[in-house]
């Protein structure tokens, strides 16, 4: 039996960036479903329907949706679709966005002199704009019901630490934490909490050899699993987290506080 402080039965959640089988988004969707929530999983490609089918096959109440959340109209449409399907929307996990690859010149990687304006804007759109658009669309629904949970999946890169040649990614992820804090203050009186989670090195299917090596240098001598990050996300969405808002929970195995590296 799920304790009342964790019980999400009767709640409906939207998790973006849930297309990867090994990613944080899919793990977060599964964690919320395990606590009783009905979940809409969203991604940019049709593989999200495979993720939805897998969760449904495990006995959870899930639907999949495809959306390009760099477009505000698409974000609004996604929220409307989730609301229309479940007749409510209580939880949003903003996980959509490109992950850091730790290599100059790849994706949004690059320092301020090598990164062009187009790449900068693309990184902001993928990571920060998408979170803003989805949150903005969901907030009126949550305000009307008097209950809501929004979680930004940021990163230690930007809000907590810095990495070479990751200026756009770091700025976008730091912006997500700033957005969470601002929304937390603006909507606390409406029963809505807004928090961020900042993962460190995570063992996902997209983890590079360099990232894997860095994970071995953390105090815990390993990268985190997606499920370990999802546990923090899920807790922030529960009734028990009702008085926690505007916070950034770091999930990095102590890496950001260690003065020494073995």
Question: Model-derived features: where do they sit?
Answer:
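Short, small/polar-rich loop/turn modules that mediate ligand/substrate recognition or access, typified
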Residues: 188, 193, 244-246
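The beta1-alpha1 cofactor-binding region of Rossmann-like NAD(H)/NADP(H)-dependent oxidoreductases
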Residues: 66-78, 117, 227-228
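Catalytic loop of short-chain dehydrogenase/reductase
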Residues: 21, 117, 149-175, 180-189
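Short C-terminal tail/terminal secondary-structure segment
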Residues: 2-4, 160, 234, 245-262
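Canonical Rossmann dinucleotide-binding motif of NAD(H)/NADP(H)-dependent dehydrogenases/reductases
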Residues: 7-40
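Catalytic Tyr-X3-Lys loop
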Residues: 98, 112-132, 147, 151, ...
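Conserved mid-core segment of classical short-chain dehydrogenase/reductases
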Residues: 99-121, 164-168, 206-208, 261
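A short, exposed helix-loop element centered on a Lys and neighboring polar residues
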Residues: 135-136, 181
